[in-house]
Amino acid sequence: MVDVLVIGGGNAALCAALTAREAGASVLLLEAAPREWRGGNSQHTRNLRCMHDAPQDVLVESYPEEEFWQDLWRVTDGNTNEALARLVIRTSSQCRDWMRKHGVNFQPPLSGALHVARTNAFFMGGGKALVNAYYRSAERLGVQIRYNTPVHALELHDGEFVAALAGSERITAKACVLAAGGFESNREWLREAWGENARGEWPADNFLIRGTRFNQGVLLKFMMDAGADIIGDLSQSHCVAIDARAPLYDGGICTRVDCVSLGIVVNRDAERFYDEGEDFWPKRYAIWGRLVAQQPGQIGYSIIDSKAIGHFMPPVFPGAQANTLAELACQLGLDAEKFTHTVTQYNQACQPGHFDHTLLDDCATKNLTPAKTHWARPLDAPPYYGYALRPGITFTYLGLKVNERAAVHFAGHPSRNLFVAGEMMAGNVLGKGYTAGVGMSIGTTFGRIAGIEAARAAHKEAQHETA
């Protein structure tokens, strides 16, 4: 019997496995995916949000605890556990040396992401390099790793872990860490969560999955049925408006379309529906998936002109391009007259100001609904560009309730030897909304906590057995 069983194969699971092994525990990690698809959604990430009180290598200026907390409070509308959130924030200032020890390297942000150079540390080689570094380190330390091993159930006794069931196999351990992701890949569950809208549509049918196809929520559902304490809203998730041409699964970061704040977004009726310049893009990009999901047909269109080029990270795939608004509308399948009218109304509402995309500038509209409060410039410099957008689910927020020790709870009581990290508990910190890089901050923090706590629980059990 191993000391610690880790179920999952992404960032949180790997952090748990590594810290448990460093604490002297024998560790077995079970990854549902085959080796080539290992890493869950972490393989598609690119940065970590970090508190720091002074400049550090790739992080400029400072990003103190209180500012990080206020950013998180705003994007979640207060739907967060402050004690756990501050634990994540403080830990984020101390984790990068540990990450480097396990082979993770950092780089300055690329030119299109300089606005997060103060708040986010970017991984050299992206999330795939991070995942590969952690797996290499785990193998070197003696962590046992098994791929193609989805766990469908647990054997529990009075809120304590006994064994995991994978196929016909029963795998025992002295302690267990659950880090198997949310239910974002489970299209039937997403359909249930979003339901049918007033137009008779099932919005989730038009969702794309930004990450892994293996996060089906099987263990989350099992734990809910087993009576574990739950937190979070079934319909809340990290949901981004992504390129509508993206694949159903594993499109990753390259499907992002980051020009929304530099132009306007219209629905299939060629109507605007939200303030594109409400706040800096890293603090608002994750609301646009839900906004698009609420539109007819769950589709939107991001529209810019040539003045926007160079102010954002260009999408991997070129959008529609035209020298007239009517021609662009035709390419996008929009009514040309309605579209031209919408753009003309917007252009006329734009007030003179000093454009600065690095600040909350004074370029706003007047007498326009919805208003655009920053970076509002007329769309009058052809060629014009358009990108069709669909909701892209990254991960869901429904999860297991935890304390500062990452313990799973049953009827308000923490389990002695069952812990949880990553997406399966992120809803404790993210009740709604998102800000760039915080998912990795949560996974890294609670993965490491869960690993050390599981090792301690296993050690105590071993002492009890020998007593």
What are the functions of these language-model segments?
Residues 147-160:
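A conserved short coil-to-beta-strand element within the FAD-binding core of flavoproteins
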Residues 222-229, 340, 442-462:
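Internal hydrophobic alpha-helix adjacent to the cofactor/substrate pocket in enzyme cavities
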Residues 26, 32-144, 150, 189-192, ...:
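Conserved N-terminal/central alpha/beta ligand/cofactor-binding core
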Residues 1-2, 167-175, 414:
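Core beta-strand elements of the Rossmann-like FAD/NAD(P) dinucleotide-binding domain
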Residues 216, 220-340:
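An anion/pyrophosphate-binding glycine-rich loop and adjacent beta-alpha core
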Residues 340-432:
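A glycine-rich dinucleotide-binding beta-alpha-beta segment and adjacent secondary-structure elements
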Residues 1-12, 28:
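Beta1/beta-strand and adjacent pyrophosphate-binding region of the FAD-binding site
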Residues 171-242, 449:
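Glycine-rich loop(s) and the adjacent beta-strand/alpha-helix scaffold that form part
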